[in-house]
């Protein structure tokens, strides 16, 4: 084991470094024809026509691991599959942060689950706000590095592209943060929306930087939000530790089977086509919104959404709702007291957004 891996494993809570975890019946490498080791029913439920649900699922389904590894350009040993990225975030915080001692650094306004998991674990929440400029709401990475060092951050979450801001972080900047915090913190890049950013993934940096981890999901571009297939990609040694901290059966069989089908070439080709459509619609909607009265600013976005500031965000929200369009009210988030986040829908759905907002201004 090399020094870089040793440094990362040293970030794991001391009481969990030798933790064996729960050994489920399915994790045993036994072979046989009659399976009587897990107290499962010998008969399928009448509602289960295929009879596949009476057995516990594989803890980390092999076909899905191999498919995700191929999709993300990594090895299966670098993957941990969980119930959405939320589970991976929670596992990281619980496995690395000692309550009352360690901290989790976030860059608000940002995805809220980082803060939720930190607070549930009793870890200090360290905030380095995004900076609003002509280039958008962007992470101040110098401040991230300095604050992480000064305040004992064990985990640093970089949301790239950022939700809800839409700004991205260049890979050389991600690498700079990882180098600066080597031996002190694990830098976690949340790439839930990276398919829309049209850049290489931070997974390309993992070989050189053991204190880097990447979150990916099938919920967004791959349109499988209900299946809850999230993936943490990191050094195999760290993945092994986190697997011991994970619940024994995190991936239901129907979800795994659906995800494997979604990773077949034909499905991936259709997904790529839809990503192209979303990017084109994002830019069309951005330009059209920017020309509407009452719209103060539409931020450039590398995700499948737009952050929009309004002169009267409540009126805009109510107008859209009256037209049957539900968007995300961001006004409770730091720095976003006048903002809504609008997901990029189909061309017809985006036209409804524009029609509703245009009609409101015409009637005013």
UniProtKB/Swiss-Prot annotation:
This is Histidinol-phosphate aminotransferase. Transmembrane segments: none annotated. It comes from Stenotrophomonas maltophilia (strain K279a). The keyword Amino-acid biosynthesis applies. One of its GO terms (molecular function) is pyridoxal phosphate binding. Homodimer. Its cofactor is pyridoxal 5'-phosphate. Its EC number is 2.6.1.9. NCBIfam families: hisC. Belongs to the class-II pyridoxal-phosphate-dependent aminotransferase family. Histidinol-phosphate aminotransferase subfamily. Pathway: Amino-acid biosynthesis; L-histidine biosynthesis; L-histidine from 5-phospho-alpha-D-ribose 1-diphosphate: step 7/9. Keywords: Amino-acid biosynthesis, Aminotransferase, Histidine biosynthesis, Pyridoxal phosphate, Transferase. SUPFAM superfamilies: PLP-dependent transferases. It is an enzyme of class 2 (transferase). It holds the Pfam family Aminotran_1_2. The modification N6-(pyridoxal phosphate)lysine is found at residue 220. One of its GO terms (biological process) is L-histidine biosynthetic process. The gene is hisC. It catalyses: L-histidinol phosphate + 2-oxoglutarate = 3-(imidazol-4-yl)-2-oxopropyl phosphate + L-glutamate. PANTHER family: HISTIDINOL-PHOSPHATE AMINOTRANSFERASE (PTHR42885:SF2), HISTIDINOL-PHOSPHATE AMINOTRANSFERASE-RELATED (PTHR42885).
């Amino acid at each position: 084991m090399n020094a870089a891996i040793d440094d990362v494993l040293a970030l794991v809570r001391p009481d969990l470094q030798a933790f064996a975890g729960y050994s489920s019946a399915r994790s045993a490498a036994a072979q046989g024809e009659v399976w009587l080791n897990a107290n499962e029913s010998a008969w399928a439920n009448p509602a289960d026509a295929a009879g596949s649900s009476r057995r516990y699922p594989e803890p980390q389904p092999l076909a899905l691991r191999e498919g995700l590894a191929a999709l993300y350009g990594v090895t299966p040993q670098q993957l941990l599959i969980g119930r959405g990225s939320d589970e991976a975030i929670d596992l990281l915080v619980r496995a690395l942060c000692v309550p009352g001692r360690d901290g989790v650094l976030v860059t608000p306004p940002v995805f809220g689950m980082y803060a939720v998991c930190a607070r549930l674990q009793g870890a200090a929440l360290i905030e380095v706000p995004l900076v609003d400029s002509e280039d958008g709401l962007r992470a101040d990475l110098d401040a991230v590095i300095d604050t992480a060092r000064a305040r004992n951050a064990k985990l640093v979450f970089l949301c790239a592209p950022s939700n809800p801001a839409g700004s991205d972080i260049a890979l050389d900047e991600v690498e700079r943060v990882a180098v600066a915090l080597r031996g002190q913190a694990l830098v976690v890049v949340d790439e839930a929306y990276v398919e829309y950013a049209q850049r290489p993934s931070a997974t390309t940096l993992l070989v050189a930087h053991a204190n880097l981890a990447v979150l990916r999901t099938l919920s967004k571009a791959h349109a499988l939000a209900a299946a809850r297939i999230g993936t943490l990609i990191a050094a195999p040694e760290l993945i092994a530790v986190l697997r011991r901290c994970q619940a024994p059966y995190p991936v239901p069989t129907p979800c795994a089977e659906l995800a494997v089908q979604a990773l077949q070439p034909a499905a991936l080709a259709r997904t790529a086509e839809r990503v192209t459509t979303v990017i084109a619609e994002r830019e069309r909607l951005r330009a059209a919104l920017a020309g509407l009265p009452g719209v103060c600013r539409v931020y450039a976005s590398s995700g499948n959404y737009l952050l929009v500031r309004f002169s009267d965000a409540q009126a805009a929200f109510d107008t859209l709702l009256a037209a049957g369009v539900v968007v995300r009210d961001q006004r409770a988030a730091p720095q976003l007291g006048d903002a809504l986040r609008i997901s990029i829908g189909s061309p017809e759905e985006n036209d409804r957004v524009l029609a509703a907002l245009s009609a409101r201004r015409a009637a005013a």
